């Protein structure tokens, strides 16, 4: 396992610099004193209404409550620090039905009914030398080529090795080797890795390495590479720059690029895909306006492993606007109501239009054949309203309303739908 060897080598090199290691560990207060225990209560209502699918389940509606406890120990003192991370998640059905299940909030039985409750627990062992940390076990990840999601009730987790290093100021490096996945509505932490769009057999492991560097307070860059066994090699780059125009006025430019090509046994068929997005956000006081363009160059969609591994500007509430050869444009407006004396209240309205979809040249023996037509197009309008309590006994409690309207022609494939979500989060820091 090359990644594990690399991780051990990196830790050995860090240990060799004993002065640096001792200095880094000297800041540790110990296993107990640096420990943190956090609790999150999440109440989630999800409604999705398909408008043009008479031959299948066209309506999904569920309501559930989740309780998530996460513990992170400190590190033992000394040149090498040891610690553990642990979590326990519980999901409870409040309302569902056989004809309304399938929102992703709750597991579904063989009879098509949502389970009354489900839960999971896990953890990871960790060690630290200086500012380099190695973990093994079940964890959440945030890399642009492999990121677990928390867009439904309970978080996703992945099982494997992860190493992160911050030895150089402004430079954050990480690498990972993962072999199993726990999906958002599952209690099985030993499930296979999965694709969001492909079908059929996929690789059993994913490896990645990369990092980000803050060139200045206004400019940052990121580079990553990953290998999904016998499926693809994927590369990612990001450039983010903020121009301060005047007091309360700024312009942010964010560029993201993915390059994906099949490798090994090519279990998903031939893949040669370059996808990028360019977004500009102008902020003036409490107002913000966003314009973005996204392009997919390839006969397969831009696909990804894990629920949140898509760092592109036009990935929306429902659609990712990532179909073969798709071009999409986005415009959005946001307002922070603190400007009118209501701190904690924010609103956003976004519209995206995607055209030129053509998936007819996808590998006929691959995992994406037959998904898209020759002249697909679609649009999505999202409305997002969120309020966070600023003080008092309910401080940090948030209420979020999300509405999406998606319309598509037959060649696009996702169909017409209306989707509404209500998410209430109440985080607590116990330790």
Predicted regions located by residue number:
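Residues on the lipid-exposed face of transmembrane beta-strands in outer-membrane beta-barrel proteins
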Residues: 39, 67-73, 123-127, 161-165, ...
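Outer-membrane beta-barrel translocator/channel fold
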Residues: 174-197, 248-324, 328, 407-415
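Repeated loop/turn-to-beta-strand initiation elements of outer-membrane beta-barrel proteins
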Residues: 79-81, 131-135, 170-174, 182, ...
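C-terminal structural cap/anchor segments
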Residues: 293, 298-375, 380-388
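Beta-barrel outer-membrane channel/assembly domains of diderm bacteria
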Residues: 8, 14-141, 247, 383-390, ...
